[in-house]
């Protein structure tokens, strides 16, 4: 392909078949508008314009060849609306180019499209089946020259956030080595030392053996050395310790660009991606379920604040409890009687953005443990290996808070008007105000069942005072 700098006939034919299938499905679903863009491979190819004309003729699609700057902007939108970082360096590593963007306070400070990609570097410098040492060193020199022309990247010491096929394959390889319990790649973190171990492994194996590496797709095995070498040089130039892998990129950026301009007053950057995505998941609920979920969230948040001296949780833990409270019944979509177990799985696998994998596992623990884990369930908790003893300990405390909040609306009638707590060394007195003309027996029964678990966890007696108003 890159000997002549032209798109090959087989490559163009594969793309056309995919686009024709896409257009066919879009028509079947009565889609009235399609936005289609082409990136560096078409932008840099001598026959790129010819390919765009062929696409128009064969599919009816107006394929827009976007600039490197626009490619970086759209990649940024896909990342910033799905990853909870404020300051970081994005790289979108493709076949023909690498878009690099410096982000500060969730805004683009500077970006560049580097003319180095996994496919073009392999095609340019690898002349045989494998890189010779001389060829590899030439490629590394070319990568460094391209990166070092951007002094604004040097020693930023910010996390690297990678999107694109190379980044995803790196994450898959690392997860398989660790027998990682969460298969999701989005927001997966890889420390520098584990990345270099992976790079050493792929460099040490010929193509046939690389194809057998668990987690590495056979289609990418031929170009993975060049791709990972770009990441390695970025790691060193930026001088950072962690690679974060993003599952959302340019494609999602196209959506957020449209969504922002049409539904967010022209701003394609969502202010609070965690709450926004949680509320998006809540859209699947009925009106009554939604009212109940938001009510439980308010009650749990009130108890978190009033009982702070008992758990000493920070604001990040408060947000964990808020999201777990909002989505505590999500598992009922699968099965009512075991909804806590299903909710645990769904919390980890739903499109909830702005959370690390550890935070996802922690929220799942809150939901599952709020219904009481047996010793066997606790030991075999699927995502437990991601939580340390301290996280489990605070998780058990917050689980009790969530359980009591749920019990306070056991009847789904939203009867609790106000909560007030009086805390002493031996006792917590919870004063619950409710309408005097309403029957509160269902709620009373549910709350009283949690007095014993509360004492076991907080080492204090929970005294309930029911106060009709």
Segments (PLM) and residue ranges:
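Helical "lid/coupling" subdomains associated with nucleotide-phosphate turnover
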Residues: 2-25, 39-46, 51, 59-81, ...
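Feature 926 captures the class I aminoacyl-tRNA synthetase adenylation module centered on the KMSKS loop
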Residues: 331, 445-456
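A short amphipathic beta-strand at an alpha->beta junction
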Residues: 457-469
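Acidic, divalent-metal-coordinating active-site segment for phosphoryl/phosphodiester hydrolysis
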Residues: 96-102
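Short secondary-structure junctions
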Residues: 410-415, 456-460
